[in-house]
């Protein structure tokens, strides 16, 4: 695994595929939180203990192949520049919390759909990402990695409570399941607030594209479970999947309603946004996200032909500030970023059309 490859290829291999309900669901993620019995938790540990966790992983797991995932490499946060850390966050490979630690690290698969974060809020956080609505498949992969690690270490586990974690909401299975979903129909019909209220009443959490505290740029929302204690992994997955299927149905109905009642207005909105993306010389990230959402909706509804629906996911990542600066080879001012963002989008659309 090459750091240059990770940094210079903004789109992870798993992002290029499709999955069930990919017209609305962009990705499914499973995260398992675990702690080692022999060490203090990350929130309490000192530098020496944090380094011991890193050394344990370096000795036991680096460059070891796990079928069918291949080999894993180790990225240490204190060996990366702030810009490189930001790129990893923008690619959804690590959390903003891990990027801010000096003694954190990430065990990463070659396909980049599996990462194991070390010394974040817990000793390890196993993350698996899949395109579309594939929670069960993601859980299966996460459990394979979990079993692989558990052969070499003893987890902090209580017979009554389950896995012991730093945050009480993760105690139990330690499982956080989440789905990234594109909901322009519900936003345009002004039904999104009511839907979010219903989701929250069901014990789920709705966040923006980069998790807690982030905005829902481009009409992309992240829906996840909140509590894990007292529920099995299978029940958590089944509950979230059931809610997601209802949201998918509501989004489809909203899109149908717009097409029936406001077809010309919607088509105009889609093509105006396409025109902005195809011709702008300067574009800010928020405007780019809005226009990309409109174009993706136009592709899904058949208004725009000859452009891959994955363009939303791809360009939402490619046009983030960190990745733009990584491509530029160094820091960029706001206007320089807006110029490069617009240039990259125009070029990507031109290639797609040809």
Curated annotation (Swiss-Prot):
GO terms for biological process: phosphocreatine biosynthetic process. It is an enzyme of class 2 (transferase). It catalyses: L-arginyl-[protein] + ATP = N(omega)-phospho-L-arginyl-[protein] + ADP + H(+). The keyword DNA-binding does not apply. ATP binds at residues 27-31, 92, 125, 176-180, 207-212. Pfam families: ATP-gua_Ptrans (PF00217). It comes from the Bacteria. Transmembrane segments: none annotated. InterPro entries: Arg_Kinase (IPR023660), ATP-guanido_PTrfase (IPR000749), ATP-guanido_PTrfase_AS (IPR022415), ATP-guanido_PTrfase_cat (IPR022414), Gln_synth/guanido_kin_cat_dom (IPR014746). Keywords: Allosteric enzyme, ATP-binding, Kinase, Nucleotide-binding, Transferase. One of its GO terms (molecular function) is protein kinase activity. Belongs to the ATP:guanido phosphotransferase family. This is Protein-arginine kinase.
